[in-house]
Curated annotation (Swiss-Prot):
Signal peptide: none annotated. It holds the Pfam family DUF1292. Belongs to the UPF0473 family. It comes from Clostridium botulinum (strain Eklund 17B / Type B). It comes from the Bacteria. PANTHER family: UPF0473 PROTEIN CBO2561/CLC_2432, UPF0473 PROTEIN CBO2561_CLC_2432. This is UPF0473 protein CLL_A1177.
Amino acid sequence: MQKDVEYIELLDEQGEQIKFKVITYFQIDEINGEYVVVTPAENDECDEAFVLKVISDEDGNETLVSIEDEKEFDLVEEAYNLVMSEQD
């Protein structure tokens, strides 16, 4: 995934494209994971953010998926808070 992308479009459950603003992109070396934090682009006042994991297949194609594992999510949340505190 390009690290300098400002917006991405994702498909919802109904197959419709929704535009998201990329808040930040980061890696966690300890668990060999890449993550992106996004928020809906249409609603600038939305406090809701989504953390997605970047998964690459054997051909190098990337897919964004939600994080199901609670321990992984806790590590990602901690890393995100650190990244955001460094940006302040």
